[in-house]
Each structure stands twice: as C-alpha cells, then as structure tokens.
Amino acid sequence: VIMTFYGTITFNQQISFMRLISVNLNGIRSADSKGFFPWLKAQEADVVCLQETRIQPEQLTDVMLEPEGLKSAFEFAVKRGYSGVGLYFKKKPDRIQRGIGWAEMDTEGRFIQADFGKLSIVSLYLPSGSSGDVRQNFKYKVLEYFEKWLLEAKKSGRELIICGDWNIAHKEIDLKNWKNNRKNSGFLPEERAWLTKLYTDYGYVDVFRELNPNPDQYTWWSNRGRAWEKNVGWRLDYQVATPGIAAKASAESIYTAERFSDHAPLIIDYDCRL
C-alpha cells in the first residue's frame, strides 16, 4: 500500500508488486477457526483465490465477506457443504464471471474469474477422481472442457493467471511417493500428459516451477499417518499463467508455519501493479 502524507511525502514507494495468493481452505469456516483471517490480513495480498469454501451464501460471516481491506466474490456449489470457489481483492474488478458456462461443472462451483484491465485472474478447483471411476471419468470430462477454454483464452490475447487446486501432480518431483502413486488419481499418466500439453503446446507457464526448481515443495498433505510432519506431500496447487505475466513473477513461497487446511497457501509476487 502506498501511503501519502499531506500529499507530499510518500512512504513505502518501493512496494510496486502484485501479491497473488491461492489456497484450498478445505472449508472456509474451518480455516477461519484455525486463524486464517488474521494471517491473511498480514499478507497484504492484492488478490486471493479460494477453493473448496464449502459454504452457502447465507452462512458467510462479515469477516468472510469483507476481510480487512478486501472485498469478495463467491461461486457456490448447489450441494451444501461441498466445493465452491471465491476471490478476495483490494481493487474492484472491471468484471466478475461466476462459472465457466458449462452446467455440469458450474453446479459444483469450480470456477470464478475477475478481470482487471487486460489481466484475468481465475480461481479454479478441478475435481478429484480419488473416490472412484465415476468421479475420475468426470474429471477427464472437465479436463477436456477446460482445455478448450484455455485454448480460447490464449487466443483472446489477454494475460491470464489461473490459481487453484488442479488435483494433479505434474512430475515425479511434485510428490514424495511418486513410485507408489503411478496408478492413483492425481498422478495418472493421462492427467500428467494433459498438464504437459498445456505447457508445451499452448505455452502456459507453471509459475512456481519457473521460480523454484527444488524438490520437496508440496502444497497438500494427507491427514493419514504423519504426512504433514514428515513432509510427505503433493504439489497440487498452481498458478498457471500466460507467458507475459508469468515473466513478471519475482518471488514465491508456500506458507507452512501454520496449518489452516490440508493445503498450504501458495504465494507469488509479480513485478506489476493491478
């Protein structure tokens, strides 16, 4: 935040970046009870992309609707206590789009987009297929539909950042126990190849990986065993962007000092102003 005193003295002039946070909350009420909102206030983020809010409009509290310094927009699942995405933002967007335009996906509350000038920011929650064949087949349908959407979005010429829980670990480096998970949803060859296609054929960029090539960088840990304690995790949360805005990314972090969810917040700073 740039503060001006009597219109002449400016403090914090060095702050000229955009901070973008993506976090799967595994229930916004649960995250609230674990201290998420005091932490969020301290981040001074420009935009926050939420997934798996698991809430209905009438259940939103004042702090959920307007955390200090932020406004909000939400997209809800029809089914109560399930899925749902949202956005927090300092600057009012020019436009908000709730849903991607395909009923099968939109009834589950998996997509919301905010446009700021020539930049679009999406909060995305791709389905998990881990419960069985029915959901895995639905996941493939969503990937097929979303791929077409991504292709059209690229053609539009707009800059785009898609933040969210993609429910896919791309490469062996992106999960601890990759050998034992090659036949499991989230690390299936078809899912991984789909992500590769987005990067190599369509030119989208995995922003975190451009900044941090190191192993053991995870954003989700199973609640079974001592996965969190031992850092036996998966990198399922991404900020995927068009090349122009991706090139402006300057710093990344995965916040693990506190635990608000089974996912950790993914924070990336971009050398631009919203």
Question: Where are the regions a protein language model picked out?
Answer:
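Active-site beta-strand termini and strand-to-loop segments that position acidic
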Residues: 90, 114-117, 242, 268-272
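Active-site beta-strand/loop signature of hydrolases that rely on acidic residues for catalysis
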Residues: 23-24, 40-58, 121, 149-172, ...
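Metal-dependent phosphoesterases centered on the DNase I-like endonuclease/exonuclease/phosphatase
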Residues: 47, 68-71, 142-232, 236
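Active-site-proximal beta-strand elements of phosphoester/diester hydrolases
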Residues: 18-26, 118-130, 163
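Conserved beta strand-loop-helix elements of the APE1-like EEP
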Residues: 80-96, 215, 225-247
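Surface-exposed cleft-lining segments at the edges of enzyme active sites
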Residues: 100-102, 126-143, 180-184
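Structured beta-strand-rich core segments of catalytic domains in phosphoester-bond hydrolases
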Residues: 53-54, 60-129
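N-terminal, active-site-proximal structural segment of metallo-dependent hydrolase catalytic domains
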Residues: 2-67, 77, 82-85, 198, ...
